[in-house]
Amino acid sequence: MESGKMASPKSMPKDAQMMAQILKDMGITEYEPRVINQMLEFAFRYVTTILDDAKIYSSHAKKATVDADDVRLAIQCRADQSFTSPPPRDFLLDIARQRNQTPLPLIKPYSGPRLPPDRYCLTAPNYRLKSLQKKAPAPAGRITVPRLSVGSVSSRPSTPTLGTPTPQTMSVSTKVGTPMSLTGQRFTVQMPASQSPAVKASIPATSTVQNVLINPSLIGSKNILITTNMVSQNTAESANALKRKREDDDDDDDDDDDDDYDNM
């Protein structure tokens, strides 16, 4: 910083000396030499702008020359645009009082960033996790069943009766072993009937063996109870005896009819 005495020698222009005197009157004694140049440029620009506006107002009022009224009007209009002063303190207090009467919005219970609704955000996941477990494809028409081991076969024969079939219950005990697969096959289980003791009926009962077809899809892990109705041979013989009796009765009726016809 240089003093005003050093910045205002006698060799300075008259406008610069006048600006230095203004600064001295304002109590500014220390300043840079370029301050005077900037103040001169501002004064020249401001004065030319005011004079241009005064000419416009004078021509609009149809005056031959620019008078003091035109300059005052130009200064007033330019002051409203270029130099704005802050509003009075009382005016600011009234505005602040009105503004503070408005209640503040309620504070939400949750904290965090204020985000718009989810449909307007990109925070939702737009992907899916792929499962690592691979499902083995089941072969078509293939059934896995446990292996069966046929144990003892027991039968309890009952006393046969003429004219009615004799039901006989056969139970097959199974043991669950290692699983095996059967592809649409059927197997045959032969269940022989045990020799029955002495039968009270006069017609002896004959033992028979029946074949039972078992579907593999119906086999489970539990014991299987197979029930068969075994009809003894005496049922067929009784049916044949009844048939022969009916034929004999028919023959006797025919003979009686012939005798009656001969007598006539």
Curated annotation (Swiss-Prot):
What Gene Ontology cellular component terms go with this record? MLL1 complex; nucleus; SAGA complex; transcription factor TFIID complex; transcription factor TFTC complex
List the biased-composition ranges (Polar residues): 151-176
| Residues bearing the modification Phosphoserine | S149, S152, S155, S158, S181, S196
Gene Ontology molecular function: any one: DNA binding
Fetch the Pfam families from UniProt: TFIID-31kDa
Q: Main location per UniProt? A: nucleus
Which residues are annotated with the PTM Phosphothreonine? T159, T161, T164, T178
Task: Using the UniProt annotation, give all residue ranges assigned to the region (Disordered).
Answer: 150-176, 233-264
**Keywords assigned:** Acetylation, Nucleus, Phosphoprotein, Transcription, Transcription regulation
Q: What does this protein do?
A: The TFIID basal transcription factor complex plays a major role in the initiation of RNA polymerase II (Pol II)-dependent transcription. TFIID recognizes and binds promoters with or without a TATA box via its subunit TBP, a TATA-box-binding protein, and promotes assembly of the pre-initiation complex (PIC). The TFIID complex consists of TBP and TBP-associated factors (TAFs), including TAF1, TAF2, TAF3, TAF4, TAF5, TAF6, TAF7, TAF8, TAF9, TAF10, TAF11, TAF12 and TAF13.
Assembly description: Component of the TFIID basal transcription factor complex, composed of TATA-box-binding protein TBP, and a number of TBP-associated factors (TAFs), including TAF1, TAF2, TAF3, TAF4, TAF5, TAF6, TAF7, TAF8, TAF9, TAF10, TAF11, TAF12 and TAF13. Component of the TATA-binding protein-free TAF complex (TFTC), the PCAF histone acetylase complex and the STAGA transcription coactivator-HAT complex. The PCAF complex consists at least of TADA2L/ADA2, SUPT3H/SPT3, TADA3L/ADA3, TAF5L/PAF65-beta, TAF6L/PAF65-alpha, TAF10/TAFII30, TAF12/TAFII20, TAF9/TAFII31 and TRRAP.
Similarity comment: family membership: Belongs to the TAF9 family.
Name of the featured protein: Transcription initiation factor TFIID subunit 9
| Source organism of the structure | Mus musculus (Mouse)
Gene designation per UniProt: Taf9
